[in-house]
Swiss-Prot record:
PTM description: Palmitoylated. Proteolytic cleavage by MCA3 occurs prior or during secretion and requires MCA4 membrane localization. Cleavage is dispensable for secretion and parasite growth and virulence in the mammalian host. In vitro, can be cleaved by MCA2 but specifically cleaved by MCA3 in vivo.
TM segment ranges: none
Tree of life domain: Eukaryota
Location(s) in or outside the cell: Cell projection, Cilium, Flagellum membrane; Secreted
Membrane topology: Lipid-anchor
Species this protein is from: Trypanosoma brucei brucei
Keywords: Cell membrane, Cell projection, Cilium, Flagellum, Lipoprotein, Membrane, Myristate, Palmitate, Secreted
Protein known as: Inactive metacaspase-4
Phenotype of gene-disrupted mutants: Knockouts in the bloodstream form have an initial slower growth rate in vitro which reaches wild-type levels after several weeks of culture. Knockouts in the bloodstream form have a reduced growth rate and virulence in infected mice. RNAi-mediated knockdown at the bloodstream stage results in a more severe phenotype characterized by a growth arrest due to a failure to undergo cytokinesis.
Upper lineage: Eukaryota, Discoba, Euglenozoa, Kinetoplastea, Metakinetoplastina
Length: 353
């Protein structure tokens, strides 16, 4: 990407220098290891208390991340990443692969030579390399604000969440009956985080010239960022419907270039992979099916278009027996036939401008 090469050092028993992460081998080996397992549905949740935005922004200004690996060239702006994996260990909501998801995504980004200058990793498993803290509600809100704070043109942001997703009754939203929610590890005590608040903290104030890519591997995630454009297919009685980027909301326009890839539709559950032998010959690890397929596409050597990335991910899931359908939405009408990239501004479909 832009000629940059990462020179990360290894972690764990092979650590060469503290503070440097190498997850390329983890991500590659992970693909040797998936059969669908049933995700426990949390059920609709009560709306949480409203976020204290002033306190959240103040805490964000006191926060910082770390550089995960060395890069050979300096990007034009800051390149920040926030990775959240929640397994809910020893609870009724327990999942088994969400922390694997974020390690696999970080490894895929490293293999693509994505020049991260600062990252934060929130995980409820202590053995995740570079872990910043636990994915509590307060921490997630704090670092969502950290990711977006003081963003300037040419900055590149990346966000990944793997965990439970659920719904709460919508409030003051003419477009939806429900609000989608992500689920912190302490949701029983402190509640979920609704999509309106994620949009307000992470997206709404980003200036023109900033690029954000967000991945949500969770149930009910199709419109998690409430973005105005999405890839949709029109159905027709004769089966000749058309597919493309179309405006799905008349509000929530933002200046930044924001891309969201979500594991499934708002009314679907996101499945996990317990043992990836459905994808490859052997293995034992677990993780989110959408993350698994998406990172597999991202790590391919040949170039992909935006549409290729989405369609191939969908096809890979379907061919292995998964029923969920990943979604793509954006702040602007992306020209999906252009080459996929995590950096730079979107090539736009002029007919929708």
């Amino acid at each position: 990407m832009g000629g940059c090469v990462s020179t990360a050092l290894k972690v764990g028993a092979e650590t060469v220098a503290e503070g440097h992460i190498d997850l390329i081998s983890f991500a590659i080996n992970y693909f040797k290891n998936a059969v669908p397992y049933i995700v426990k549905y949390l059920g609709r949740q009560q709306r949480p208390k409203e976020v204290d935005m002033e306190a959240t922004l103040t805490e964000a200004k006191e926060s910082k991340g770390f550089q995960p690996w060395k890069i050979s060239c300096q990007p034009k702006g800051a390149v920040r990443g926030l990775f959240i994996g929640v397994n809910y260990g020893n609870t009724e909501a327990q999942l088994s692969g969400c922390c694997h998801d974020i390690m696999m995504m970080i490894g895929a980004l490293q293999k693509r030579n994505f020049p991260l200058t600062e990252v934060v990793i929130l995980a409820d498993e202590e053995d995740v390399p570079g872990r910043t803290g636990e994915p509590t509600r307060a921490n997630i809100l704090r670092y969502l604000a950290w990711l977006a704070q003081d963003a300037q043109p040419n900055d590149v942001l990346f966000f990944h969440y793997s965990g439970h997703g659920t719904r709460a009754n919508a409030r003051d939203d003419d477009c939806e009956e429900y609000d989608q929610c992500i689920v912190p590890m302490d949701y029983v005590e402190n509640g979920c985080i609704v999509d309106n608040e994620i949009h307000e903290i992470l997206v709404s104030q980003l200036p023109k010239g900033v690029r954000l890519t967000a991945v949500f591997d969770c149930s009910h995630s199709g419109s998690m960022l409430d973005l105005p454009y999405a890839y949709v297919c029109d159905s027709s009685k004769d089966g000749s419907g058309s597919c493309g980027m179309k405006r799905v909301r008349e509000d929530n326009d933002v200046q930044a270039d924001v891309l969201m890839i979500s594991a499934c539709a708002d009314d679907e559950a996101a499945l996990g992979v317990d043992n990836t032998q459905d994808f490859y010959e052997s293995g034992k690890d677990s993780g989110g099916a959408a993350t698994f397929c998406l990172t597999a596409m991202m790590m391919r050597e040949e170039p992909l278009t935006f549409l290729d990335l989405l369609v191939h991910t969908r096809e890979m899931l379907k061919s292995r027996g998964f029923t969920q359908v990943p979604h793509l939405s954006a702040s602007k009408p992306i020209n999906l036939m252009q080459r996929f990239s995590l950096e730079g501004l979107f090539p736009q479909e002029r007919t929708l401008l």
